[in-house]
Regions:
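N-proximal low-complexity "stem/linker" segments adjacent to membrane-targeting elements
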Residues: 1-27
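A short beta-strand-loop structural module common to alpha/beta enzyme folds
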Residues: 34-46
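Conserved donor NDP-sugar-binding/catalytic core segment of glycosyltransferases
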Residues: 44, 71, 75-114
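Glycine-rich, basic loop-to-helix element that forms the pyrophosphate-binding segment
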Residues: 44-58
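Short aromatic/hydrophobic "clamp" motif used to bind/position activated sugar donors
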Residues: 63
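Catalytic metal- and UDP-sugar-binding loop of GT-A-like glycosyltransferases, i.e.
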Residues: 66-68
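A recurrent flexible, glycine/aromatic-enriched loop bordering the glycosyltransferase active site
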Residues: 125-149
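Donor nucleotide-sugar recognition loop
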Residues: 140-141, 152-163
Length: 163
């Protein structure tokens, strides 16, 4: 495991999205002494299967699992990740999550906290799901559009069989 390395992991089936996501990744500020790689999985059976393949291909301690249509515009993104992961009890972080996992198992139907910058019907803007009182709050589920880990745990491809 390389403690000074970030891996950006995405399953891709749209070349235009993939190229744009990589464009933004290449423009992020990389903390001194750290390196980055991008691991793009094409023709994955499912996101979980693709993420498991990528996990085996990368020795990076920090893995950023992201959808192909996510464009990371915060230049200091990697520095912020390191700041949060100073707490070794934190295994995964994301931008949006559910403090309590909904009974129906669908995160989008429960209360959520966090925010993201997105394109809506009125143009681009920040969408806030719920206020976050601290730089990091405990949630039971993280939205899959962007998930960052500091420990490798296999993805449940036996349960999550779709994109």
């Amino acid at each position: 495991m390389n403690d000074k390395k970030f891996a950006f992991v995405m399953c891709a089936n749209n070349e235009q999205y993939e190229k744009e996501a990589l464009y933004y990744i290449e423009r992020l500020e990389v903390p001194e002494g750290y390196s980055c790689e991008s691991v793009v999985i094409r023709e994955a059976e499912s996101m979980a299967e693709g993420y498991n393949r990528a996990m085996q291909l990368s020795d990076a301690r920090y893995k950023i699992y992201m959808h192909q249509d996510v464009m990371i515009t915060e230049k200091k993104f990697l520095k912020k990740i390191l700041s949060l992961f100073k707490n070794r009890e934190i295994g995964m972080i994301g931008l949006v999550g559910s403090p309590v996992f909904p009974e129906n198992g669908v995160m989008w139907y429960g209360d959520r906290i966090g925010s993201l910058y997105t394109q809506g019907s009125e143009g681009y803007g920040t969408y806030i799901f719920g206020q976050v009182a601290a730089p990091c709050e405990y949630v039971e589920a993280v939205d899959g559009f962007l998930m960052i880990t500091q420990y490798d745990v296999p993805w449940r491809a036996d349960i999550f069989k779709k994109w």
